[in-house]
Amino acid sequence: MEKELLLSVHDLKKSFGEREILKGISFDVRRGDVVCIIGPSGSGKSTLIRCVNYLEHPTAGTIDYRGTDVNEAFKKLTMYRTKVGMVFQSFNLFNNMTVLENCMVGQVKVLGKSKEEARTTALKYLKHVGMDTYVNAKPHQLSGGQKQRVAIARALALEPEVLLMDEPTSALDPEMVGEVLRVIRDLAKEGLTMVIVTHEMAFARDVSNRVIFIDQGVI
């Protein structure tokens, strides 16, 4: 039986001024898929994943989530982003908050959870990525690899159906890359649906069930 279709990207185009970055990209993501997007620098990989999360609004084309056009159905994109989470290359943690608070804030403000419930969920996912002993640390006290693991836990705490990752290891020192890739590998084994922009070719081959190669804005 074919797996449930979660995301469908159809003829996606994105221009910045006169420059067309994405020139008609189409692909589907089904439950349990791990799709890696690879390609040379400047090919449009990060623009594509930012469009899927609506951090950039596509110039043309559609993105359907569970058969419904995101642009039409989710007037509040915040709710869509709880279903389709995002991990950034630059972590995007709140520097004035502890590790635990970073993983709680979205649950309370967006999902309307109680602080107690949010804390329980946050601790669960921090433990999952091996960061539960750092709950009271601030981001500036962490290494790059630790920050990225916290960022992954924060995204997981919203319990998304699809997790998008934009070059999750590109801002890390080489010795930190392995610890983050290990976490992502574990998530893949557990069946989490993911779309990952990466330049780690061996990792893409190892972890994904589909690789999309983008060059000059096309697949």
Kindly give the residue locations of the regions a language model identified.
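ABC family nucleotide-binding domain
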Residues: 4-7, 13-219
